[in-house]
Amino acid sequence: PIRQELRRLDNLGLLQSNEDWLMEDSVPVDELYDTETDPHELNNLAQEAEHLEIMELLKRNLFSWMVETKDLGLVPEYEMIEKSKGGAPYDTFSGNFDPKPILDLVDKIGRGKQHIDSFNFALQSSNPVYRYWGATGLAALGQNAVESKELLQSTLNDPVPYVRFAASEAICNIGYPRKGVEILSKGLDSESVVNQLHASQILMAVGKNAAFALPKMKIAIDNLYKIGADESQSYDKHRAWYTRENLEYLVSYLNGKENTNSN
């Protein structure tokens, strides 16, 4: 409901100047709020000089906690499911999972082109999680990642779906949307609802470029309704619902009749 209202107000041009950032395509890399004086977290203090010290302290504490607890938020969902094979992901990863080097890479995302070599290097790793974050870092650079075109094109053939999807977003962002959207469109055919959801999220991110996938999106929506009606598919129902919502919103948007009642 909150997102619906934000979209409605944004479409009407009624968001205030300190609120319109909520509808931006990306969020700030760092965020810090005074929740006592700003309970709705509208005034980001992260870049103000007087708050830099506390910002760095909180960041260090957060990263230390993520390393100590082996935070699996750094691992794509598909990877967790595949590796744990129905067991508890934490049990699967807790033994040899070291989040620190991944966290160091992730922290570079959104912080400028000076980190492009780190993303390119990660994209060539034998570890798909590194490749994923390398591609995600290049996607965040937009046109500034154009020098990585050949590397990204080869990554479109990566054996791991979530790596292909991240590379697809990056290739779209440097001006080659047809190739990227083709990969994402195929992702909607996946037998894994996790992959379908991820592909739909990236299609949302590439916006108007997703028009190449309109026919496939309409087919996917019909199939997702069937999953929602199948009582034996209870585990995937929520993912199917979110995927369908993404695609229905995107189809409406691409057809020029954005549905402001969509989540």
Task: Write out the residue ranges for each language-model feature.
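C-terminal, low-complexity/hydrophilic appendages and adjacent surface loops
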Residues: 1-47, 53-56, 66, 82
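C-terminal substrate/ligand-recognition segments
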Residues: 22, 28-42, 69-71, 90-110, ...
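Extracellular/periplasmic ectodomains of large secreted or surface enzymes and adhesion receptors
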Residues: 24, 56, 64-68, 77-122
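Structured segments of extracytoplasmic/periplasmic soluble domains
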Residues: 48, 61-69, 209
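Sec/Tat-exported extracytoplasmic proteins
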Residues: 62, 66, 221-225, 258
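Structural detector for internal amphipathic alpha-helices that build alpha-solenoid repeat scaffolds
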Residues: 95-112, 121, 129-144, 154, ...
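Amphipathic alpha-helical scaffolding segments comprising HEAT/armadillo-like alpha-solenoid repeats
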Residues: 112-124, 144-157, 177-189, 209-222, ...
